[in-house]
Curated annotation (Swiss-Prot):
Its EC number is 2.5.1.57. The gene is Nans. InterPro entries: AFP_Neu5c_C, AFP_Neu5c_C_sf, Aldolase_TIM, Antifreeze_III, Neu5Ac_N, Nonulosonic_Acid_Synth, SAF. One of its GO terms (molecular function) is N-acylneuraminate-9-phosphate synthase activity. It catalyses: aldehydo-N-acetyl-D-mannosamine 6-phosphate + phosphoenolpyruvate + H2O = N-acetylneuraminate 9-phosphate + phosphate. The modification Phosphoserine is found at S275. Keywords: Acetylation, Cytoplasm, Phosphoprotein, Transferase. Catalyzes condensation of phosphoenolpyruvate (PEP) and N-acetylmannosamine 6-phosphate (ManNAc-6-P) to synthesize N-acetylneuraminate-9-phosphate (Neu5Ac-9-P). Neu5Ac-9-P is the phosphorylated forms of sialic acid N-acetylneuraminic acid (Neu5Ac). In contrast with human ortholog, has no detectable activity towards D-mannose 6-phosphate. PROSITE patterns: AFP_LIKE. This is N-acetylneuraminate-9-phosphate synthase.
Amino acid sequence: MPLELELCPGRWVGGKHPCFIIAEIGQNHQGDIDVAKRMIRTAKECGADCAKFQKSELEFKFNRKALERPYTSKHSWGKTYGEHKRHLEFSHDQYKELQSYAQEIGIFFTASGMDEMAVEFLHELNVPFFKVGSGDTNNFPYLEKTAKKGRPMVISSGMQSMDTMKQVYQIVKPLNPNFCFLQCTSAYPLQPEDANLRVISEYQKLFPDIPIGYSGHETGIAISVAAVALGAKVLERHITLDKTWKGSDHSASLEPGELAELVRSVRLVERALGSPTKQLLPCEMACNEKLGKSVVAKVKIPAGTTLTLDMLTVKVGEPKGYPPEDIFNLAGKKVLVTIEEDDTVMEESVESHSKKIKA
């Protein structure tokens, strides 16, 4: 059983706990704090467990040339990449305001720290857990410093190899045992054949003591629901209020109706996973009573006869008798009373045979 960890106060993940659903707002708020609040409320109303943002301290995430390069994309909010990113970046005070709003309406709030200084700020903000974006998963100094903070970590694995993920595990585990990996492919939108959900099972084999989850960038909800069926214990999906808005993430994000349907479907699948024990269930009793078959006499069998298989057949019988799987065990047993042709073989009719009648 994968390790269970308390990802947020009172909210555990792993084991038999419900999948933890993260609504990734990222920077789909368009740099507008009122839109950001609407998205937090949407995440709450749709049933997500957590609203998540992306926090950067731009001078620590990008070098000067990266910030100064021209940015002429249709998604641009400025002439340079730096201007574009600054438009989308909330201040520390705005983050505190958003956190307070999330607490007020009752949803967990966190962010990906996109650089070491952002992690420092989020630590001061007292977020319940750190999200490590795929771009920092192989940033080992960052991982070490983040792990040493002692907060739970959710680590995405887009753009990484299995060898790299093994190294990540070896680095983080001794410093902070409370973390999980998310299978992720960094493409927007993600094509189904590139989702590679089987990696979830491989992670479960290689890292049996941590929960495994899925971060999806595909369109629709089917692949994410399948990930939960495969055992994903944390599920992250980008959300938007309008897929047509400016920004490269919107097309791979879920609108409110889709997010609500995702949450409903995940909870339905979790109920459907049920128990690994195969048994006749109470809900099957009516069908078993109507359609369940019993061992029936193929011919008239006089009292004192030793049963052979050619004397017996299987039919829907009234009343119910021995189930079909008992027929081989009945062979060789002595009949105590005469059984008429086409009658059900009952317990009291056969010598020394324990009753296995399904009821």
